[in-house]
């Protein structure tokens, strides 16, 4: 399958983006944690101040999924800032449906993301990968990615909404 196109997502792609987010979550054994809705995606990514950007991989009709989907992959990203090195492209989610892997779709998405990062003068692209996800780790390493958790010893933390509310209310 040589025919596919990578393009910026539009608001009308949100149902497909949500479908792929859920497929990725299932692949990562976390499908019960997706609480986002299609409406959230539309408001958060396509409003006046988008919180994320998204690329989608679209195949022609002859390669649609058995369920009739033309969108078979996506990458959700946003820009952030590191006071040591400057602008970063943060890759939040990246997924290609299993039946469509091995055709260069993921590589082309990553190429497009790299072009976006260079156009915006980003110093690097950051992302997380589950420790058990060797295929993805190898995919990224083949393209020059370094594992900061082992090289620099960083740990990822989060503060849930419950605690954010508590801290915000403190006097």
Curated annotation (Swiss-Prot):
Alphabetical list of CDD domains matching this protein: NAT_SF
Active site: 140
Domain N-acetyltransferase: 4-170
Keywords: Acyltransferase, Cytoplasm, Transferase
Chief location of this protein within or outside the cell: cytoplasm
This protein's GO CC annotations: cytosol
The UniProt record lists the keyword Transferase: yes
Subunit structure of this chain's protein: Homodimer.
Effect seen on changing residue 92 to Q: Reduced activity
pH-activity dependence text: Optimum pH is 8.5-9.5.
Functional description taken from the UniProt entry: Enzyme which catalyzes the acetylation of polyamines. Substrate specificity: norspermidine = spermidine >> spermine > N(1)-acetylspermine. This highly regulated enzyme allows a fine attenuation of the intracellular concentration of polyamines. Also involved in the regulation of polyamine transport out of cells. Also acts on 1,3-diaminopropane and 1,5-diaminopentane.
E.C. number: 2.3.1.57
Record-given protein name: Diamine acetyltransferase 1
Residues bound to substrate: 27-28, 92, 126-128, 152
PROSITE patterns in the cross-refs: GNAT
Record field: catalytic activity: an alkane-alpha,omega-diamine + acetyl-CoA = an N-acetylalkane-alpha,omega-diamine + CoA + H(+); spermidine + acetyl-CoA = N(1)-acetylspermidine + CoA + H(+); spermine + acetyl-CoA = N(1)-acetylspermine + CoA + H(+)
Any GO molecular function: spermidine binding
InterPro entries (alphabetical): Acyl_CoA_acyltransferase (IPR016181), Diverse_Substrate_AcTransf (IPR051016), GNAT_dom (IPR000182)
GO BP terms, alphabetized: angiogenesis; polyamine biosynthetic process; putrescine catabolic process; regulation of cell population proliferation; spermidine acetylation; spermine catabolic process
Family from the record: Belongs to the acetyltransferase family.
Transferase as UniProt keyword: yes
Domain of life (superkingdom): Eukaryota
SUPFAM superfamilies (UniProt xref): Acyl-CoA N-acyltransferases (Nat)
């Amino acid at each position: 399958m040589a025919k596919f196109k990578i393009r910026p997502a539009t608001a009308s792609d949100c149902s497909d983006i949500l479908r792929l987010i859920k497929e990725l979550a299932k692949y990562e054994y976390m499908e019960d944690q997706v609480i986002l809705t299609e409406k959230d995606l539309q408001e958060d990514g396509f409003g006046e101040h988008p919180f994320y950007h998204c690329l989608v991989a679209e195949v022609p009709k002859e390669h649609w999924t058995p369920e009739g989907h033309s969108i078979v992959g996506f990458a959700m990203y946003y820009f952030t800032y590191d006071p040591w090195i400057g602008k970063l492209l943060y890759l939040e989610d990246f997924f290609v449906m299993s039946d469509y892997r091995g055709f260069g779709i993921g590589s082309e998405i990553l190429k497009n993301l790299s072009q976006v990062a260079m156009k915006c003068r980003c110093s690097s692209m950051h992302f997380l990968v589950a420790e058990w996800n060797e295929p993805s780790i190898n995919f990224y390493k083949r393209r020059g990615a370094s594992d900061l958790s082992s090289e620099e010893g960083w740990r990822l933390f989060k503060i849930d909404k419950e605690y954010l509310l508590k801290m915000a209310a403190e006097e």
